[in-house]
Amino acid sequence: PASPARSIYEECLAMADCYLTWDRADPAAAQLLEALIREIGQLPLDGRGGPRCMVNTELNSGNFLINEETRSYLVDWEKPLISEAAQDLAHFLAPTTTFWKTDTILDREAVGRFLHAYQRAVNGRSDTGALAHRLPLFFTVTCLRGVSWCAMALREYDEPGRALTNPDTLRKIRAYLSEDFLRHILENYVRRDFLRGIVS
């Protein structure tokens, strides 16, 4: 897409609308989701960023097959795009990704260590200069994408006669839509630049 951050944001609007128009939506969750949409919508979503490259778009730790003595692989390329590296980095590090399978939310120090290691590993093969201003933007839209997907999924899970249900997935979806989690995303990743000073 010409504007990857805008594209993600628009995808989020459609997913969130499924929940926001649902008569069983939790009012507190709906209000916080609307605040996220409103405030993230005011960010420079159409700005140009770093060099374009192929991105996985759903990068998480489970997609890496690490082999000590032979080649390692990145798998699960269902939705690759030409975008910016910041899109995959944000998805990999965002709390909406790390919390899904591991119940872990990376703190600033852990994210900083990862980003410094990433920049050392790139070692000039690609321009990482745009990360300082693009990564915070992708962090916020990635967080919105995670909670919007959960909002849509909760409505789908509630449909009568749903054939497939997974209690662990449902528990996690509800955790993402809790007032505490949504407020954490809003206060720490939207209203505050979580990455300030750790991305150079």
List PLM regions with ranges.
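Soluble or luminal CAZymes and related metallo-dependent hydrolases
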Residues: 28, 32-35, 106-110, 114, ...
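Amphipathic alpha-helices that form helix-helix packing interfaces
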Residues: 12, 36, 147-150
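All-alpha amphipathic helical-bundle segments outside canonical DNA-binding/catalytic cores
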Residues: 3, 125-141
